Design a protein with these regions (language model features):
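Small/polar-rich, solvent-exposed N-terminal microdomains that initiate assembly or binding
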Residues: 1-67, 118-121
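Acidic-leaning, charged glycine-interspersed low-complexity segments
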Residues: 6, 19-24, 50, 95-149
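Generic alpha-helical propensity signal that fires on short helical segments
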Residues: 45, 69-71, 95-97
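Glycine-rich loops and low-complexity Gly/Arg-rich segments
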Residues: 54, 77-81, 100-105
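Short, cysteine-centered beta-strand-loop-beta hairpins and adjacent loop/turn segments enriched
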Residues: 61-65, 82-88
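Oligomerization/assembly interface segments of phage tail-like spikes and tubes
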Residues: 69-84, 141-150
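Short histidine-centered catalytic/ligand-binding loop motif
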Residues: 86-98
Length: 150
């Protein structure tokens, strides 16, 4: 039996490094343990202002389908960009950048899944429905972006 557990941290770190838009806008990949524990950002905030944050914890669901039980994992990724304080035009520009990167990531994940890239780890990901939510205007001081779950 082969282990096809999806390594979300390694995968999204690779996407961040290979994505031209991320490189051009100096996005840094880091980890967190949910929105309340952003230790990766705190460790790197002096050197970077744009982040791809991958949660190092997963939500899971065990369910029965026929005769066996299966586990389904939910992975969360944040795309965050800092904007100039009290500058709503800059905030909108940075939010649009995060949206654009999100669409690029989705395209790449679909491509990788069907080409069996990343050692086939994306094989069992359900990419037909990906939930995303944008940060509200006052969610994090001076930072905008979105998170998505798959």
């Amino acid at each position: 039996m082969t282990d096809k557990t999806f390594d979300s941290i390694a995968y999204f770190t690779k996407l961040c490094e290979e994505n031209k838009t991320c490189r051009d806008n100096k996005f840094v990949a880091t980890t967190c343990s949910g929105p309340d524990t952003v230790q990766g950002v705190l460790q790197k905030f002096r050197k970077a202002s744009n982040f791809i944050m991958v949660s190092d914890t997963v939500d899971s669901n065990t369910h029965s389908a026929g005769e066996g039980f299966f586990e389904r994992y939910g992975y969360t990724v944040w795309i965050l960009a800092a904007y100039k304080r009290d500058d709503m035009e800059d905030r909108e520009k940075k939010l649009n950048l995060c949206r654009y990167i999100f669409r690029q990531f989705i395209s790449r994940m679909l491509r990788d899944k069907y080409r069996e890239a990343f050692e086939g780890q994306l094989e069992f990901l359900k990419l037909t429905q990906i939930y995303s939510s944008e940060l509200g205007r006052w969610s994090m001081n001076g930072v905008t972006g979105l998170y998505f779950m798959m």
